Design a protein with these regions (language model features):
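ASCE RecA-like P-loop NTPase motor cores
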Residues: 1-138
Length: 139
């Protein structure tokens, strides 16, 4: 219901036209729920994967949850957890989550990825290299 109302506004048409070409875009002035609704409508219209940059991981998680509620498949790409000194035991949960999100993204299973700015600034493996090292298991 809200999406159909939104799609008939002049502002939506301008934003949709600007996103039809490659490159970044920024949106300011809407509350988070309004941005999520707008991004979900744009993704459904344009069929492109959204990369939404947020200030932190909490905001990325909330945004991904909002997008999931609007019918998109979304994931949070967490920042890498650095250990600056030796520790007895270190969990690898964040690395596993990062690899899982990269795999879903490379496999075309995501409509949107929510990325904290910290994670966006960290290096990751190039797509071709990542796909070369994947193993597909059929069950």
């Amino acid at each position: 219901m809200y999406e159909s109302l939104l799609k008939h506004t002049a502002e939506y048409q301008k934003i949709s036209a600007s996103l039809a070409t490659p490159g970044p875009a920024a949106l300011f002035g809407l509350p988070p729920a309004g941005r999520a609704l707008l991004y979900a409508a744009l993704q459904k219209d344009l069929g492109r994967v959204l990369c939404i940059v947020t200030p932190g991981e909490a905001e990325a998680t909330h945004f991904a949850d909002d997008l999931k509620a609007l019918g998109l498949t979304a994931a949070v790409f967490p920042p890498r957890d650095f250990m600056l000194r030796p520790v007895e035991g270190a969990g690898r949960e964040y690395e596993y989550r990062r690899l899982s999100v990269l795999g879903a993204l490379a496999g075309g299973r995501l409509n949107a990825i929510c990325v904290p700015a910290e994670a966006l600034l960290q290096y990751t493996v190039p797509r071709a290299e990542f796909q070369k090292n994947l193993s597909l298991i059929h069950i």
